[in-house]
From Swiss-Prot:
Span of the annotated motif Nudix box: 355-376
Keyword list, A-Z: ANK repeat, Cytoplasm, Hydrolase, Magnesium, Metal-binding, NAD, NADP, Peroxisome, Repeat, Zinc
UniProt protein name: NAD-capped RNA hydrolase NUDT12
GO MF assignments: magnesium ion binding; NAD+ diphosphatase activity; NADH pyrophosphatase activity; NADPH pyrophosphatase activity; phosphodiesterase decapping endonuclease activity; RNA NAD-cap (NMN-forming) hydrolase activity; zinc ion binding
Amino acid sequence: MSSVKRSLKQEIVTQFHCSAAEGDIAKLTGILSHSPSLLNETSENGWTALMYAARNGHPEIVQFLLEKGCDRSIVNKSRQTALDIAVFWGYKHIANLLATAKGGKKPWFLTNEVEECENYFSKTLLDRKSEKRNNSDWLLAKESHPATVFILFSDLNPLVTLGGNKESFQQPEVRLCQLNYTDIKDYLAQPEKITLIFLGVELEIKDKLLNYAGEVPREEEDGLVAWFALGIDPIAAEEFKQRHENCYFLHPPMPALLQLKEKEAGVVAQARSVLAWHSRYKFCPTCGNATKIEEGGYKRLCLKEDCPSLNGVHNTSYPRVDPVVIMQVIHPDGTKCLLGRQKRFPPGMFTCLAGFIEPGETIEDAVRREVEEESGVKVGHVQYVACQPWPMPSSLMIGCLALAVSTEIKVDKNEIEDARWFTREQVLDVLTKGKQQAFFVPPSRAIAHQLIKHWIRINPNL
């Protein structure tokens, strides 16, 4: 009985595929209305109805099947998708239909379970306490409080020192220089020459406030240890270094900032991004007049009384963040990933493709556009994974998995230098053996590395 059922099903599948190949939409509709599960059924050679319609040049059938939710990412035994077939046979209209159809069915190898994770630059020591930014009296009192911590920047580079025991065989830690009021009070006396940002208060209540008992009136003590970022000019920075020989300004930012402890890196990401904004917006973007710093460093106020920016809330008055999509593009069969490289990269380094989101664009559309612009590969399903602040100067890297619906690579040399498909085995070797391989990927503190590892983890049996 089971063999009879199998034979009957095979006959129906064959009729369904033949109607797609012949362009018989009436017959196709009739079969599908009685047996909707046939939509993505494959023949012995792995072909679907969508592939047969694409091969034989029937755009109306392709459109119909797409509207029914047909999976564009299925790969036949020749490793082709429906889009690959349409491109090979020169059916441009069908290729455009397949390439521009948004979304698509989630492939079997992508899980719904995406755990929230904290990437490098996203952890912090501080509670930002944004409600205190308008309290000028509180901020002023905290500036001179003996427990307050100041971190110094010059040209956006943080002042650091090497921690650890000199007799230790371990690599010394790069730590932020945590300064106090007496270290920097001369700079605070010249507000026109500095940029001061309130970063927040320490999350953990520590005993160090007890060390200053009696120095601050009890009624003024709230138990909060404030942190500020202080930007000074290069001349002042050089003078400071001469007085503090154990400290130095950490540069260039990449890869130097990746040496910091994770929670200190989060503080630097916050401070560096806001300081970078101030360095670029000394004058009002609306009228060109001079501006002044307000709200603990989180606003610039135009000094021209009739400036339109003073009426209402305007994004030009507040620190900006630039959203960037970064995506691990997965081959339609799930066994390979697409990585690319720019000319400025170290020799042999490949990473996930990335690009800025344009105005009026969704995350998903930005992923599809950027991948096609840089590599020529078409993308269907897009799934968010995680994000990472990236203070170069102030980006938010939005990490996604993207399922390719085509496989041919056509690199735009104006965008990137190279792009290639890499097998899971190749990527695993790189992650375990590092630079001993023919190529390498970014370090573990970059979200690209985490996206690549995420793809490896969800495909253990491929």
